[in-house]
Structure formats: structure tokens, C-alpha cells
Amino acid sequence: MSELPPGFAVSPRNQQTFKSHYITNDSSPTCLGLQVDSIASLPYRDPARQEKRLPIRILKMLTAHTSHILHPEYLQPLSSAPVSIELDAKKSPLALLAQTCSQIGKPDPPPSSKLGSLSSSSHGDKDSRSSSSSLKSGEHQNLDDKSSFKPYSKTGSECRKEGAGINSSADKAGFRVPNGSSSSVTCTSLPPHAPSPRASSPQQTSGQSHTHRQSQSPLSQKTAHLQTTHMDSKAAGSDPGNDSSSSGSDRNGKKDSDHNKSSLDVVQIANSSHARASVNSSSASSSSSPQPDSKTDSQPPQPSLGTGHIAPVSPFKPGHSVFPLPSSTMGYHGSIVGAYTGYPSQFVPGLDPAKSSLGMGVPGKHPSSSPLTGASPPSFMQGLCRDPYCLTYPNAPHLGGSNCSSCVHDPSSALKSGFPLMYPTHHLHSLHPSSLSSSATSSLSHPLYTYGFMLPNETLPHACNWVSVGGPCDKRFATSEELLAHLRTHTALPGVDGKLLSGYPSSVSSAASCHLHLPPPSSPGALPSSLSLRGSPGLGLARYHPYGKAHLPGAPSLPMHSLPATAPYYSPYALYSQRLGSASALGYQ
């Protein structure tokens, strides 16, 4: 009563009128409208009309929002069935937004359960769209659903090619993966007029197309597709030891799929995480097949890899860009528990297959790798040791010690100095101090500057990485002495006599120790384990510190040496060597 306008007099008569209008059941807007219409026929100054006047505030409260009352279909909670959201999407943009948000990143249900939910929800509703969508979803598995956003779905042809790669890899290792986990998840049921493209004989093709024509309902169609996929896997696995027959059938399958691409409808498959999971499971189970025969190939050859494989493209080897997916069940010692294994043999040119420590002695194949597989060339990444504390480079075997039993240090690859050392050694790793001077070939095989990639077949292997204001130098030289003489032209100051620099020994090991803040090989504390780009904790102090001294004291095990005569040559390059190395190792040289 205190919120009434000032012109509204409070009297017992008005109180009775107020109670009769707002507290009793006559307070609905329709009753009020009838009473107002009957009173409106009276003259304006009639006392009966004046005493029944209502405040404007209460009238606004009663009549303002009657036209905006929500319909009951919007007040109902959104069900899990996609049809109700589809039907509401025609009327409400909010329902369309809710449908889009609920389907992002969520895998599609299998065709049988989705068909059941569609048919059960469209019993009471005679809308033509719901019935047609239920039929379409049974046959084509969400053929072009424009109201749902599926960013990770693939087309049917890629799915079938991926399935071909899965079946060939699984059957070749002698371990047949169940069809429910590999093919039926990734490739949904085909349309009735499309035969399976991976047929190995014309009779089988006619039988499959006849089976597909006979099956009309989606459930029987899915069963027929499972049968044909099983027949395909049996046909592909009929000769698991012969690689040429499997790859030939895969090529025939690709030709058939290209031929049928015009007649095939686009089949939307499930989320690609399901496809990748099934690929991983099939390749893992094929790699871990318990066969004593070591000649059985665990991965398909390069031509028979399907186009659905996701692989990084290496700029260093343009011909080989598809890496097979690693297996997750091959165990070996070290903390990297078998997560990165199984690269093809063309990435491992110089390793001895007899030194492979796994039971799958595939010729020319080395199972070790590293977590940086996609970021670096495979011919460099294959040689990293599987021991997490032994990260030396096998092409420089003088750096490795005899205590690391898991390294594959092949002396035949010593002269093939492919990609230089990138990983640091652990500071507790025991090495041979005398092995550097034991063989001249091993010391010559190690590159002069251990940053920057050098191609294995490069005629001029030594490149100048000096970066000035005008850009990098990028000149190449055949020997390290020529490169050292060229570097003196960069570092020589105008007022410094060249005789000061001539007394410094110009050999490979001493130059490398100079530019990496290491003692020369003749000093008593020489540690060849420190020849690395990102050094152990003592070498990490040798980076360029703008507010510190030029030479910081290192770890006790790594004594820093002083260069009194060669300071004009030594200090400018040594301060920036770590930064130049990290830039060139990432491909910016």
C-alpha cells in the first residue's frame, strides 16, 4: 500500500476494492478487462467510475508482458535425442545454438541406436522432415546434416582407404584384428548401390554388390557390410608373408575406389578420434603379435600405406613423407615406454640390424626414436638412444661410453656424419676420455660446429653460420681448416695483428672445444661428453648474459679455460654460439 501513487486515497472502501481485484480469483486480466469495459460506459466524472480506477503502475504490471509469454515447448528441457532439437531449430535460434554446441566434439552414435532413437521420437510426430531424416540416417549415416557442425569428419573414400591400410598391416603380421574395432567403427555402412571398393576378385565384387542390393533395412545393411569387410580382411590376409600381393590388392582397391568415387555418396563417419584410436589399436596389436619368426614385417611397405595416415612432412627428405603410426605395446628399458617405435627402413640407412635389441629383427629397421619425431628429420631422430640419460649421437661413436648398453653405436656409420649432435649428455654419464685420440676417423667424422643440420650427401659439409647485420654468411667449405680460416676474416679486428691468432691450433677437436667453451683435448680435464648444443647444467651458464661477465665459472667437472692471446677472436663468436645453434637447429639457418 505504500507504493501506491499519491492520488490514490486510502479508505476502507478503496481497500475493499483493492482486495476484491488483486487477492481474490477475479484478479485475472480477462476479468479485469470485462469490469473495466462495463465501467468505461459510465461518464468520466461518475463516482462509481472514479472509485474503481486502478493505479497505472499496477496496470502496467498486469498487462505489459502478456504478449511475451513463452510457449510451453521452450520451457521443456532439451532431450538427448537429436530430432527434438532439430524440430525446435526451425523455430528458435536458441535451440539451434544448443544443438550446435551439444554436437561439437561429440562422436555420433552408431547407426542402430540412432535409428532407434529417431524412430521412437518420431512416432508421435508426423513431421515429414523427421521421417525423412530417420530414413536417411539409416542409409547414409547423417548425409549432409546442415544443422550440425562436424569439423573432424572424413569422406567415405578416405575412410575406406584407411581401412585398407589397417587390414593389410594387421593381416601381414599374422594377427587379425576383430572387425568391430577397426573397420566397422571407422567405415559405416555403404549405400545399397555401391559395392565395396577393396575387392580382390570380380566374383567377390559381384557377390558383395548382390548382398548390398538385397539388404534394404539399415540393420541388415550394416550386417552385410561387416560380412564383406570380414571377407576383405580374409582375402587380404590370405598370404601374410608376401608383401607384393597385399600391396597389389591395395593398389587395385585404390583404383576401384577412384572408379566408384562418382557413384558413391558422401558417407559421414564418426569423429576422427575414433578412427585414430582404431588405427592405433590395430597397428599396436599387429606390431605385438606373438610370432617367433623375425622375418615377418610388422608394418606395411611404403606404397601400401593408406592416404588417411596423418604424417608430418619432412623438408629434408622430400620422397618419404608418410610415417607409420607407432605402437604402444612394445616395451623396452628406459623411461620412454615404447611410445615411439617402428619407422620404415629407408629412414635408417646405416644401422646394423643385428644390434637391434627387440625381438622383431626386421632388416634395416631400428625401433628407437624420440619425442621430437615430427620436428626433426627421421634420419637424425632414428639414432637417438633409448636410454633417457644417454642422449648421444651414434654417428659420433667416440662420444659414447661402454657403460651404455642400450645405445646402438655402429662404427660403419662413423663416416656418414648425417645430422650432428643435438641432445646433451647427462652430467653423470661416464665416457672414455681417451677415445677421442684413439681413432682419427672418429674425430674427423664429428662436424666442426655441432649446431645446424648438414645434409648427408652434401659435397661441402662445413657451412659458415656467421650472422652479421647483413644476414647470415652461409658459405660452405670442404674442410674444417678452410672454414676456420674463413671465420678469422669475420672475427679479425682492424688493429689486431694476425700473428696473435696463428699460434692457436687449427684442428677439428680444438676448434670445436674453442667454440663450445671446452678445454682443448691436450688439457687434463678434457671431457668429450660436453660436445653438445644444449650442454649439461655447467654449460648452460655459458650462454650470452647481457648483464654478466663474459666467462662465467662452470660446474666443477667442466673447467673453463682462459684464452689470453686469442680473446679478440674467441669472445664475439663464443657468446653467440648457443643462440645461433638453437636458431639453426630449428631450421632458420
Curated annotation (Swiss-Prot):
Region (Required for self-association and nuclear localization): 498-589
Zinc finger residue ranges, C2H2-type: 462-490
Compositional bias of kind Polar residues: 179-188, 214-230
Ranges of Low complexity composition bias in the record: 113-122, 196-206, 237-250, 272-299
Parts forming coiled coils: none
Keywords in alphabetical order: Cytoplasm, Developmental protein, Metal-binding, Nucleus, Repressor, Transcription, Transcription regulation, Zinc, Zinc-finger
Ranges where the record places region Required for interaction with Groucho and hdac2 plays an important role in repression of transcription: 408-460
Protein name: Zinc finger protein 703
Organism of this sequence: Danio rerio
